[in-house]
C-alpha cells in the first residue's frame, strides 16, 4: 500500500513539473499578477507531513519574528505577498518538497522574508530544514518575454505591411509623376516640367518614355509623339542643346534619322539594342546618356559610311582609352590643343582657328566637359572645386562660395550671367551664347570658339 502511495506521489510530482515547463517563463505573470519577486525554497522533514502542516509552520514560526510590518498574515491580507504554494512528496519515511512565495515587497524586505523561512526548524511533529534556492525577479522575466514577443510581432508586421506600403508608395509616385508631366507647344507634346527653361533637353519618342525619365529624376525630356517631327522640336533644337534618346529597335533608328535631317541635334544616345526607353532602369538610362555621341560624328558615320549607331558606339569605346592617355601625361602644357584640333573638327562643331590667350588656360577643362553634359567649377588656382551635371549648375552656384571660373558644355543665357555675376564669378566659359544683352563689368564671358 505504501509503495502504491509513493508511486502516485511521484506521478503527481512529474505531472506538475511538466505543467510548469510548458507554462514557460510567463507562468509567474499569469499566476501572481503584480508580483515583483518570487522566493523559491526547498524543505526536508524527518517524518511524514502534509501541505497544511508546512503552511502552518511558515505562518506560525515567523509570527512576531520580523515585527508587525513584515508579519506574513498581515502582508497576505494587504496583498503584499501572494498565495504560498507548497508541493510535497514522501519517500522512505521522509517528506520532501518545494515552497513558492510571491512577493510585492522591495528587494531588501523580500530577502529578509526569505531568510526568515530558513529559521523554521519543525513542520508538524517532525524536525525540518528549509533552504532558499533563489529569488526570481519577475520583472526581468517579463522584460525578456516582451522583447521576444515584440520580435515576433514586428516580423509579422513587416511580412504583412511592407508589400502593401510599397504598393501605396508606388501609386503615390505615379500620381506625382503624372502631375509633373506638362503639355508643351501648340502640338501639346508630353514633356517634363524643366523643358520650358532648361538650357538642354532630351528628345524621346513617346509619353511613356518621358514618364520613365521622370520616375528616375530626369525632368527635361520631351516626346515627338510619332514619326513626323513636330515644329516645336525643330524650333527648340535651334535654341537648346539637344540630345536625341531613342529606342534600341528599328523604329528608334528611323526616328533618329529623321531628327538628324530636320532638327539641330547636338548629341545622340540610344537604349540598349532590343530595349525601349520606357522600360529602362535608372542605371541603364544613366549609362546610355553618358555614352552619347556627338551628332556630327553620327551623321558622318551613319549617312556617309553606312554604319549604324551601335557600331559607332563600339568603335568609340575601343578608341576612347588611347585618346585619353596620349594628351594628358606627355603633352599637357602646349601640344595638347594642337593634337586635339583635328579630332574636334570631326567630332565637335567647327572651331575658329584663332584662340585667345584667356581661353587657352581653360582648354583642358573644355575638353573634359565636351565629352559629357557637365560643368566644372574652379577656384583662383585653377583647381577643380566640383564637377556637376549642367542641369544642377544654377542651384550649385547659389550654395557654393569662392567660385572663380565656370566651364560648362551648354548655352550661356542672360539668366545664367545674372546669377553668376551676383556670386562674384570672374570667368564664364560655355559652348555658345544666346540672347545676351547685358554684360557685367566684373565677369569675363568666353565661348569654346573664341
UniProtKB/Swiss-Prot annotation:
Residues bound to Mg(2+) 1: 205, 247
Residues holding Mg(2+) 2: 247, 249
The UniProt record lists the keyword Nucleus: no
Ranges of Basic and acidic residues composition bias in the record: 320-348
Region Disordered, annotated ranges: 320-350
Co-factor(s): Mg(2+)
GO molecular function, one term: metal ion binding
Any one biological process term the GO annotation gives: DNA replication, synthesis of primer
Family annotation (HAMAP family): DNA_primase_DnaG_arc
Annotated function: RNA polymerase that catalyzes the synthesis of short RNA molecules used as primers for DNA polymerase during DNA replication. Also part of the exosome, which is a complex involved in RNA degradation. Acts as a poly(A)-binding protein that enhances the interaction between heteromeric, adenine-rich transcripts and the exosome.
Quaternary structure and interacting proteins, as annotated: Forms a ternary complex with MCM helicase and DNA. Component of the archaeal exosome complex.
Full protein name: DNA primase DnaG
Amino acid at each position: 500500500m505504501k509503495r502504491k502511495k509513493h508511486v502516485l506521489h511521484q506521478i503527481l510530482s512529474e505531472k506538475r513539473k511538466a505543467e510548469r515547463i510548458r507554462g514557460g517563463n510567463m507562468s509567474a505573470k499569469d499566476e501572481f499578477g503584480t508580483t515583483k519577486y518570487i522566493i523559491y525554497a526547498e524543505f526536508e522533514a524527518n517524518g511524514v507531513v502534509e501541505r497544511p502542516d508546512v503552511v502552518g509552520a511558515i505562518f506560525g514560526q515567523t509570527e512576531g519574528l520580523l515585527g508587525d510590518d513584515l508579519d506574513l498574515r498581515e502582508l497576505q491580507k494587504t496583498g503584499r505577498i501572494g498565495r504560498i504554494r507548497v508541493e510535497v512528496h514522501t519517500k522512505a519515511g521522509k517528506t520532501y518538497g518545494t515552497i513558492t512565495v510571491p512577493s510585492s515587497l522591495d528587494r531588501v524586505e523580500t530577502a529578509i522574508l526569505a531568510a526568515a523561512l530558513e529559521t523554521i526548524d519543525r513542520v508538524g511533529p517532525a524536525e525540518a530544514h528549509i533552504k532558499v534556492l533563489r529569488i526570481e525577479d519577475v520583472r526581468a522575466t517579463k522584460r525578456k518575454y516582451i522583447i521576444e514577443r515584440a520580435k515576433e510581432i514586428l516580423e509579422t508586421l513587416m511580412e504583412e505591411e511592407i508589400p502593401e506600403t510599397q504598393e501605396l508608395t508606388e501609386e503615390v509616385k505615379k500620381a506625382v509623376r503624372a502631375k509633373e508631366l506638362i503639355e508643351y507647344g501648340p502640338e501639346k507634346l508630353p514633356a517634363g516640367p524643366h523643358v520650358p527653361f532648361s538650357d538642354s533637353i532630351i528628345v524621346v519618342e513617346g509619353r511613356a518614355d518621358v514618364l520613365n525619365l521622370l520616375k528616375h529624376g530626369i525632368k527635361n525630356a520631351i516626346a515627338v509623339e510619332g514619326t513626323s517631327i513636330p515644329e516645336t522640336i525643330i524650333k527648340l533644337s535651334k535654341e537648346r542643346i539637344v540630345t536625341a534618346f531613342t529606342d534600341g529597335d528599328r523604329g528608334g533608328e528611323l526616328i533618329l534619322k529623321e531628327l538628324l535631317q530636320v532638327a539641330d541635334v547636338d548629341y545622340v544616345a540610344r537604349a540598349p539594342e532590343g530595349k525601349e526607353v520606357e522600360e529602362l532602369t535608372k542605371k541603364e538610362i544613366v549609362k546610355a546618356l553618358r555614352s552619347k555621341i556627338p551628332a556630327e560624328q553620327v551623321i558622318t558615320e551613319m549617312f556617309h559610311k553606312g554604319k549604324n549607331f551601335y557600331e559607332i558606339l563600339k568603335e568609340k569605346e575601343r578608341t576612347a582609352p588611347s585618346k585619353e592617355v596620349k594628351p594628358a601625361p606627355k603633352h599637357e602644357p602646349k601640344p595638347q590643343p594642337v593634337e586635339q584640333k583635328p579630332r574636334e573638327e570631326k567630332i565637335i562643331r567647327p572651331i575658329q582657328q584663332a584662340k585667345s590667350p584667356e581661353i587657352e588656360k581653360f582648354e583642358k577643362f573644355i575638353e573634359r566637359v565636351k565629352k559629357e553634359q557637365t560643368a566644372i567649377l574652379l577656384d583662383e588656382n585653377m583647381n577643380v572645386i566640383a564637377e556637376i551635371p549642367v542641369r544642377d549648375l544654377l542651384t550649385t552656384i547659389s550654395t557654393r562660395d569662392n567660385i572663380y571660373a565656370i566651364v560648362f558644355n551648354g548655352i550661356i543665357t542672360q539668366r545664367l550671367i545674372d546669377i553668376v555675376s551676383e556670386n562674384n564669378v570672374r570667368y564664364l566659359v560655355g559652348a555658345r551664347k544666346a540672347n545676351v544683352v547685358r554684360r557685367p563689368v566684373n565677369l569675363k564671358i568666353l565661348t569654346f570658339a573664341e
